[in-house]
Curated annotation (Swiss-Prot):
Subunit structure, interactors included: Interacts with TMEM106B.
Alphabetical UniProt keywords: Endoplasmic reticulum, Glycoprotein, Lipoprotein, Membrane, Myristate, Transmembrane, Transmembrane helix
Origin organism lineage: Eukaryota, Metazoa, Chordata, Craniata, Vertebrata
Lipidation sites (N-myristoyl glycine): G2
Membrane topology: Multi-pass membrane protein; Lipid-anchor
Entry's family note: Belongs to the TMEM106 family.
Name of protein: Transmembrane protein 106C
Glycan-bearing residues: N171
Record carries keyword Transmembrane helix: yes
PANTHER family in the cross-refs: TRANSMEMBRANE PROTEIN 106B, TRANSMEMBRANE PROTEIN 106C
A GO CC term attached to the entry: endoplasmic reticulum membrane
Transmembrane segments: 85-105, 196-216
Length: 260
């Protein structure tokens, strides 16, 4: 505002059948208001605002009838340090976005074969079967800043291209952020039938170490932040079928499929 002239104009809807005397009276009132001077309320020589009568606000019944005019040079329309505040807000938004992107960006989840062992061996003489309880261990390394879930695990044991055992599990484990976790599971494999000679080989007392080679294919499904990935491992293992609780060493480990 300032030492300037202002007007509070009354806008009324005029119809063609309005009384000419009323229109003339309204025009005279508008001209009288337009010539009414005022200065800032905070000024030293200020006078009472004609529209609000010093109350600091316009009465509700006159909100839609009065218009306040503010000079473009009024300092209240130009807040101090506006550019600094806007720049600081932009920088803070960029920093927050960068941190969120860094911590939520998917990092690698590695799945490795940590070896197997035969925890139990039993023989079915009637059917010439060798039953192996093969306990396998997977090492899962989570490099993310949030936990990941092992939602599904499937493993299959083969001997001479014949499937002799399988294992399936859901909701296996939850891997904490930035950590390694071992997942153990046991597959029951029955070797016999067309391979009945394995029974006679594994029960032959003249042989001290009864080694056979089995092939394992393991698929692990991992889920995190609405994303699901799968890793598949294939490996050949040398196992002793002649005694229980025998630790074995892998002959060949061939990872297959995408590592997360």
């Amino acid at each position: 505002m300032g030492s300037q002239h202002s007007s509070a104009l009354t806008f009324c809807q005029r119809k063609k059948d309005d009384n000419p005397e009323d229109l003339l009276a309204e025009r005279d009132q508008e001209e009288a208001i337009a010539q009414f001077p005022y200065v800032e309320f905070t000024g030293r020589n200020s006078i009472t605002c004609h529209t609000c009568q010093g109350a600091g606000y316009i009465p509700e019944e006159q909100v839609n009838k009065l218009v306040a005019l503010i000079p473009h040079s009024d300092q209240r329309l130009r807040p101090q340090r506006t550019k600094q505040y806007v720049l600081l807000s932009v920088l803070l938004c960029l920093l927050a976005s960068g941190l969120v992107f860094f911590f939520l960006f998917p990092h690698s989840v590695l799945v490795d074969d940590n070896g197997i062992r035969v925890s139990n061996v039993t023989f079915n003489k009637q059917d010439s079967l060798v039953v192996l309880d093969v306990t396998a261990t997977l090492k899962i390394r989570n490099s993310n800043f949030y936990p990941v879930a092992v939602t599904n695990l499937f493993s299959q044991v083969q001997y001479m291209k014949a499937v002799v055992g399988s294992y399936t599990a859901a909701n296996v484990s939850l891997i904490p952020p930035r950590s390694e976790h071992l997942v153990n599971f046991t597959v029951k494999a029955e070797v016999g039938g067309p391979s009945s000679y394995v029974y006679f080989y594994c029960t032959l007392p003249a042989i001290l170490v009864h080694n056979i080679v089995i092939f394992m294919r393991t698929s692990v499904q991992i889920s995190y932040i609405g994303h699901t990935s799968q890793s598949t491992l294939e490996a050949q293992h040398n196992v002793d079928c002649g005694e229980n609780s025998t630790a074995v060493q892998s002959l060949l480990l061939v990872p297959w499929g995408p590592h997360l």
